[in-house]
Amino acid sequence: MASSMLSNAAVATTAASRSAGAQASMVAPFTGLKSVSAFPVTRKSSNDLSTVPSNGGKVQCMQVWPPLGKKKFETLSYLPPLSEESLLKEVQYLLNNGWVPCLEFEPTHGFVYREHGNTPGYYDGRYWTMWKLPMFGCTDPSQVVAELEEAKKAYPEAFIRIIGFDNVRQVQCVSFIAYKPASYDA
């Protein structure tokens, strides 16, 4: 029993001397940093509201989506209707990403609705009718806009959207409403 106590004490003193040597060679943390109290700092009291931070009054706030009376459709639905120029830019964006443009229309509902239960299910308002075939090989946004105009003439009371489809990953990457019927007032 005495031998076990001796060996434990010897191990403890050897370990202590090793750790002391290791600590001596290490740099102490925060060496050379000065205390905060060394720098004079003037702080305003939390009750002083005489000056408010400002960026010079050049803030232009965007109006948020009104919660009542308007339905949100898809991407870009919170913006005003797209002009032809901005529509061409959006189509060019999806073409630049290598996505295949496709037009779809919905004659009655341009939004997700509840038909088969209390919560919108997978089929409730998510499937639209495809306008012709996807435009594989399309390189010019004006071709897509021409098809959009043709779809508007054929179905003037339908919602029409443009989809960007990635045929490699086989996913829909972008979808936005390109036309809302004149009878839709919200």
From Swiss-Prot:
GO cellular component, one term: chloroplast
UniProt cross-references to InterPro entries, sorted A to Z: RuBisCO_ssu, RuBisCO_ssu_dom, RuBisCO_ssu_N, RuBisCO_ssu_sf
Induction conditions: No expression of this mRNA was seen in leaves.
Primary localization: plastid
Domain of life of the organism encoding this protein: Eukaryota
Transmembrane segments: none
GO biological process: photorespiration; reductive pentose-phosphate cycle
UniProt keyword list: Calvin cycle, Carbon dioxide fixation, Chloroplast, Photorespiration, Photosynthesis, Plastid, Transit peptide
Transit peptide: first to last position: 1-60
Compartments (UniProt record): Plastid, Chloroplast
Record-level Gene Ontology MF annotations: ribulose-bisphosphate carboxylase activity
Coiled-coil annotated spans: none
Alphabetized SMART domains for the sequence: RuBisCO_small
Miscellaneous note of the record: The basic functional RuBisCO is composed of a large chain homodimer in a 'head-to-tail' conformation. In form I RuBisCO this homodimer is arranged in a barrel-like tetramer with the small subunits forming a tetrameric 'cap' on each end of the 'barrel'.
HAMAP family from the UniProt entry: RuBisCO_S_bact (MF_00859)
Functional summary from the UniProt entry: RuBisCO catalyzes two reactions: the carboxylation of D-ribulose 1,5-bisphosphate, the primary event in carbon dioxide fixation, as well as the oxidative fragmentation of the pentose substrate. Both reactions occur simultaneously and in competition at the same active site. Although the small subunit is not catalytic it is essential for maximal activity.
Assembly with partners or alone: Heterohexadecamer of 8 large and 8 small subunits.
The family this protein is said to belong to: Belongs to the RuBisCO small chain family.
Listed name of the protein: Ribulose bisphosphate carboxylase small subunit, chloroplastic 6
Protein source organism: Mesembryanthemum crystallinum (Common ice plant)
